[in-house]
Amino acid sequence: MNKTAIKNFAIWARNKLIADIQYRAGLMGITAEGIKNALPQSTPNMEFYDIGTAEPYSITGEAIQQRKKLVEILRQKEKDSDYATAYKYILEEVAYTWFNRLIAIRFMEVNDYLPSHIRVLSSETGKVEPDLVTTPFDTELDFTPAEEENILRLKTNNALDELFRLLFIKQCNALNEILPALFEKTNDYTELLLNLSVVDQDGVVYHLIHDIDENDFNIEKGGQVEIIGWLYQYYNTEPKNAAFAKNGKITKDEIPAVTQLFTPDWIVRYMVQNSLGRLFIDKRKNEGVFADGRGLDEMTWDEAEEKRITAEKHLAEQMEWKYYLPEAAQTKEVREQLDKIQQQSEYKDVRDIKVIDPCMGSGHILVYAFDVLMQMYEDAGYNQRDAAKSILENNLYGLDIDDRAYQLAYFAVMMKARQYNRRILNGETTCQVYAIQESNNINRTHLKYLGAGMDDLEVNTARVQVEGLLDTLRDAKEYGSILKVESYNWELLRRFVSAADAGDQVTLDSAGLEVTVAQLLTLIDIAETIAQKYDVVVTNPPYMAISNGDARLNEYVKKNYPDSKADLFAVFI
């Protein structure tokens, strides 16, 4: 893997995407200085904007509504800070949205994981235009008659870039069915500001295809899904440097860029093999007699300890865990204590093991933990297809405060599952990784519409617990996985929230109830993941002096983690 090429592309691509998005927004009167009104000659069906040329720039139809949505979001963000911050936020948000989708689709097309098996960004035969542009109607994409007519018109006019953007958005929205956490239905303004080209040799698509060796994405040729994590880390290089350079307090929004560091592969393997792998080896080494046929009661203590170590080494070699370290020889007293601990953590069924990375970043540790779990399942007699599904449903968990990193961790884990199970991307199975969300904007007025049909005792209990949960998750992105969450009745809370009924008439009070229900169900999933116990916790924790955080983080850590209040890494330990 050529990490220099990956780094150079990711840093350059971020700046290029932001510049292109800024240009698109500027055409419609939205700049760093402010938001311009449409020119007087505008009509409800066509708006004109002065861009300093003889002819004004015009937008029509759906684009008018998309621009209105963009302005609405900017004004909302402006209230929370100022216009300059809101404008920068939009540029960064749209840029990372399309960057994440570009690199994900590149990985999928190279490994032939796309449902249509037709390349979206490149061509199997090396043409300039992607195969999707050449044969759009050979895909499984569902086009309306109007879209079909528009595609034919654009092909006739050789408007390749416009045609590509139309098809690329269509493909992203279609992938929502199988990878909803990454390919969310695009916001109106996200589509409006998309400015990708397949013809321009100085464009992001061209550089992605030509600057990074295709084999770095190709699993069959030594590529790894971990390339997604490296791309994301390098994408954040300049924001990270800027946060450090300002010499001030690190804000909530800056914590991810400042603290994320992609963990090298050998360190990941070392940590997972000596935690999750140790569970397996502890179980196996105690299941039978040793190689010479004698039981422990027939050996001297030194012989028994030597045999334990030999057995561990042998099992690790069988599993090809070269970073596994056998336990050192112990005295009888220490061994008895260790055996008690091991007996407490010994699992009866591989499906019962719970593994979490509480600050998962882009998922490197989770991806390798998936491989080790797969080995354990195969040893227990499972086939790979069933094992992959069970790992997603029962074993693997992840959390992070960064929405962008979460999307890529989710993608990486799902691609790892796809490696073992061709049918896993059917939309029926997803992974239990989450971006921690805050409760700050939950409309608590809607709680009175929840619990329809449930008895009063359950409703009252659930409402109290939901209120407590919302209080706990206020400003949750400030604290992340170090939050202390009570172990609520999760099944009750899910029933309570799902039983929403505001009647037939939508009122000012009940407007937006469906959104609140979806948000609450997500918060319940996140809170349960934080609250529950795990057999294995593996992570590369964030490294940041607490004194560099803001007052809320300082106060929370001092109150809840007084013995490790100096640095975030110590808090996680």
Predicted regions located by residue number:
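SAM-dependent methyltransferase catalytic region
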Residues: 249-253, 257-573
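Non-catalytic, mostly N-terminal accessory regions of nucleic-acid modification and defense proteins
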Residues: 1-292, 296, 414-433, 438
